[in-house]
Every structure is written in structure tokens, then in C-alpha cells.
Amino acid sequence: MLGKLDWSAIPFDQPIPLIAGAVVLVAILAVLVWVVVKGHLPYLWHEWITSVDHKRIGVMYILLASIMLLRGGSDAIMMRIQQAVAYQSQGYLPPEHYNQIFSAHGTIMIFFVAMPFVIGLMNLVVPLQLGVRDVAFPTLNSVGFWLTATGALLVNLSLVIGEFARTGWLAFPPLSGLSYSPGVGVDYYAWSLQISGVGTLVAGINLVTTVLKLRTKGMNYLRMPMFCWTTLASNLLIVAAFPILTATLAMLLLDRYLGFHFFTNEAGGNVMMFMNLIWAWGHPEVYILVLPAFGIFSEVVSTFSGKALFGYRSMVLATMAICVISFMVWLHHFFTMGAGPDVNAIFGIASMIIAVPTGVKIYNWLFTMYGGRIRFATPMLWAVGFMVTFIIGGLTGVLVAVPPADFMLHNSMFLVAHFHNVIIGGVLFGAFAGFEYWFPKAFGFRLDERWGKLAFWFTFLGFYVTFMPLYIAGMLGMTRRLQHYDVAAWRPWMLVAAAGMAVLTIGVICQIMQLVVSIRNREALRDRTGDPWDGRSLEWATSSPPPVFNFAFSPDVRGEDAYWDMKTHARQQSFEHDAPEYHDIEMPRNSPTGFICAFFATIMGFALIWHIWWMVILGGIGAFATFVVFAWRDHDEYVIPADEVARIDRINLEERRSLVSMAGVV
């Protein structure tokens, strides 16, 4: 009836996961009770859970990423403490628990922190920058988010029901095969990524279509903001790379469930095929994450330097070059597999070549800053911190792209430091910069600068104190994923890294405090102009937060920096006519399709993990029926009357006119 599921799945004999799970469960129940008692449930259902508004979906992606950051960050703290105290001892984490922690940490931070964060920012901002009212497929946008949330839920369920994979975040066979991982841990890993991967693929298709087909009048490709270009490149990579991940995990699941032997050498399979396939997805995944961050930094550096982005067309070419070359370097992750010097040399050279367009971007940002009137607001601090940090990560990346060096450093702590150098210094710094930069647009008030700068400095310094020692430990021969060690030379560096993690944690606490203080002081921090940073692209041409329809009139773009051009030439449509002619606007209707699909996907995923076959059938039929019902709906839109559009727009115009007049601009 319940397949493999019984009371032994609850870790009653393991106090750490049991207590952690109990705390999470109590917190969830407390939030649910508060929502119901305060009467917020109808509001949440109508305005958020069933919303297909790209802005709200973007915010929900970012909220999911923030929650999972706390979970993934907690795993990181536990690992750093374990390695600090595990010299000539077993530390406080048993090996099987430690292995689950580093596997969950990598999986969560890549798939459920970095991915949702950048997709959330893309959802929030790209339609506004393109001057359009929503993404191409609003309901599928909701489906994509809720499937991602389903994957995150399954990962967290493994904390208290069963176990997670002990294989590392890429689950290499034969360790991930039934012979070495007979439990449900790898199944939790694979099904959570399969379900969330479908959501990511849907989001990628949606954003590619939006950029290619829904630009406002006058916005040709070479007038798009750089963030739109990097969004296009990133989502093209999603569309091309995520089917590889889906197929690879499907073959692994067939090995585990039906006794296939795709990756079993002794039965005619080939374990190296898994390595090739997973990294054929895995290296483009790095650029799926970092390219949107590059776009964010382009927007931030240009805005806070008070200048147009230097070398715009070269930035476009560099972005698309990275998009293409990222598919040609995957083998540098396993030079030691024995492919031979010729193959290694080709992929090593390709890995060095991809640094060239990245270098072009760095120089263009520096030239943009040169001669500008730089304002070191919090988003700009994250941008400058990124440039310093990412250069170090890039240099160490070029080093491990040299096959002889990689033979010495492969699977060492040097590699761990390099990877975090790129992902934290590139992706997370970019996500934080974008969060600070576009927060006023999403919520109508700025974040507190004092707490923001404290968060930056603690995070920046904490990062270096945490990860620079790992480079040294790697060069001293320390391999990664060690639950304990006996080499005295490694211990001082593990102690320093643990101290650095404490500083990083203070940085996260400062970010939480920044949010709390900003919400408390939101009236004093209110943005009534819609343009708190003196921005250059179209998202700043509407109110903060924007109305549901984004723009009362489609903007007319006549240059690269569309809104800056409007401000410079006093051609804002807001000021062109005293009595513009408003029209009805058709908008997509809210839909529970995404939430219902996710509900049935959760049932099906959980049942597949525990081999509860009747529940698998129930979940599959429910998900399929939901899609059929959605497909046969005839009325998916509603109309906002012209009078209502006029009322909302005039309130915005009057407030902006009064503020502009007070500033002496008009």
C-alpha cells in the first residue's frame, strides 16, 4: 500500500535532522495558522498563488530562492564547522550524514537558489525593459514556477522522511546506482531535479519567446538593454542544455527502477557516458547562471556611472560568443579520464578562449566607469566587488583549464574554491545587486542603504576569508568531501575558513535586517518617481510598483538607452499630451493551473520515490487532467476598461509631474 515507506523513514535515531525537521515543520504550521487566523488566505490565493502576472511570479521565484538560501547556507555552515573540528577525530557529523549535507548543499544552491533567483529577476524585469505587458505565455510561467517549488519541496522532505543522496550534487555512477545507493536518497535527488527541470525548461522557452517576439515598437535587437540580451543568451542555453539533463537523469532512473544498464560497465554500459552527458549540461549551466548576472552588472554600472554602457555592440557579441563556446568546453571537468593529450589540448584551449569574451566585458565595465560620475550605492558596491572577485575566479579557472595543472588539482579543495569564486562572486553578487537595484521597482520603496552596505562588506570580506584558504589547502593536497582528516598542515586553513563562514553569516543576517528595517521605514524610503536611481531603460518609465498592465501606452523606442533618451529629449509620453486617448487593455486572467499541476506533481514525485504505484497513477492522471482542462478554456483574458487605465495612469502622472517640477527639471 505504501511501497517502501514505513516508520523507519523517520530519522528518530539522528537528532540533528530530526530537530531541524521539527523546527521547519513548526515554522510552516505557525505561518499557515497565522495566514488563516488573520484572514490572508483569500488574498494570497487570488493575488499570488493563482497569479499569472510576471512581476508577482518573479517575486515568488526570488522568495523561494531566499528561503532555500537559508537551507543551503545552513548546510554550508555545518560543513565548515565539521571540517574545522574533524582533525584526527570524527567531528560531530557521522559520515553518512555529512555526505548527505554536501550533496544537498550543492543541489540546493545551484538548482533552488541560483536558478530561481536569476529567473525571478528575469521575470520581474525583462517585460518591463521590453516595454510589454507580460511574458509570451503567462499561465505556463505560473506552471514553471510551481514545478520549481515542487522540486524544492521534495528536497526538503528528504530532511525528515527518508534521506537525501550521498553522491555529491551530480550523482556520478556507479555511486548513484542501486549497488552503492540502495536507499531513496538518489531517487529524491533525481525526481526533484526532473520535476524542477521541466519548470526551468518551460521558463526558458517562455523568456526566449518573449524577447524574440514581444518587444515594443522601435525596439530592434540592437536597442535592447544588455540584461535582455543576457536573458536571451541564458535562456537559449536552458532550451538547449536542460533536455540533456532530463535525458541523463531519465537513464539513471531507468537503471535504478527497471534494471537498465546505461551506466553499468560490467553489464555493457559506460559510466563515462554519464560524465560526458552531465557535464555537457553542467558547463552551460554555469553560463546560464552567470550571463544574467553579467546583464545585471551592465545595467548597474551604466546607471551608477551616469554613462551609456561602453562598447554596447561588443558586449552583445561577447554575450553570444560565450553562449556558443560554453557548449565546447565540458571535457575540462574530467581531463583525468584518459581521453589523451590531443583531446585534452583541444578542450583546454577552448576553455582559455572562453575567457576572452568575458575579459571584453570586464574592460567595458571599467571603461564605462572611467570618466563617469560614480555613485557608490549598494548595487554599485556589489558590482565592483564582483569585478575583483570574478577576475580571481576566472584566473584560477584558466589555471585548471591547463591539463597538466588539472591533473594535480582535480577534485581538490582548490577546485571547490574556484567554483565558489565564480558562483558566489559572479552569480550571487549579481543576484544581490539586482535585488537591491530593482527592489524599489517591485515594491515601491528603496532598501535601507546603511544595512545594505554592511551586508555587502561582511559578505565580501567573509567570502575571501572563507574561500582563499581553500585554494591553499587544495595546493597542499587536500581533496574535497573529506568528513575527517589527519594532516596537520590542513587544519589552520580549515579553522580560518570556518571563521570566514561566521563573517559570511553576519552578512546574511545584515541582509535580513536590511529588509526588516526597510519594511518598517517604507514610507520614508518610498519611491514616488518610479525612477529612484535615474535609470536608463524602460522599467523606470512606469510607476513603482508598476500597474498590472505595466504601461498605459506602448513606449516608442528611438535609441539604445530608451528611457534616458526620453528624459534627455523631453519626449516622455507622460508629458506629450494633456489628455491622451486611453484604450481598453486586455490582460491574462489568473489561473490555478500551475498550483494544481504542482500539487499533483508533488504527489507523483513522492510516490515514485517511495514506489507507491497507486499514488503515482493518481498524481499522473491529476496532472494530465489539469493540462486538458486548461487547454480547453476559451476565456483566459479579462479587459481593464479605458476609464480605469486612465485613472491609474493619471494618478501616476500627476505625482511624477509634481515631483519633477519640485526638482526644477520641468
From Swiss-Prot:
Pfam families, per the entry: COX1
Which PROSITE patterns does the annotation name?
COX1 (PS50855), COX1_CUB (PS00077)
Annotated signal sequence range: none
Q: Which Gene3D superfamilies match?
A: Cytochrome c oxidase-like, subunit I domain (1.20.210.10)
How does it sit in the bilayer?
Answer: Multi-pass membrane protein
Which residues are listed for Cu cation binding in this entry? H283, Y287, H332, H333
Q: One GO cellular component term, please give it.
A: plasma membrane
* Disulfide cross-links: none
Task: List residues binding heme b 1; low-spin.
Answer: H105, H420
Protein name as annotated: Probable cytochrome c oxidase subunit 1
Q: What is its EC number?
A: 7.1.1.9
Q: In which pathway does it act?
A: Energy metabolism; oxidative phosphorylation
Cross-link annotation 1'-histidyl-3'-tyrosine (His-Tyr), location: H283-Y287
Q: Where are the transmembrane segments?
A: 16-36, 57-77, 108-128, 142-162, 192-212, 234-254, 277-297, 315-335, 346-366, 380-400, 413-433, 456-476, 493-513, 591-611, 612-632
A GO MF annotation of the entry reads:
oxidoreductase activity, acting on diphenols and related substances as donors, oxygen as acceptor
Q: Which GO terms describe its biological process?
A: aerobic respiration; electron transport coupled proton transport; oxidative phosphorylation; respiratory electron transport chain
| UniProt entry keywords in alphabetical sequence | Cell membrane, Copper, Electron transport, Heme, Iron, Membrane, Metal-binding, Respiratory chain, Translocase, Transmembrane, Transmembrane helix, Transport
Give the family this protein belongs to, as stated in its UniProt record. Belongs to the heme-copper respiratory oxidase family.
Catalysed transformations (reactions): 4 Fe(II)-[cytochrome c] + O2 + 8 H(+)(in) = 4 Fe(III)-[cytochrome c] + 2 H2O + 4 H(+)(out)
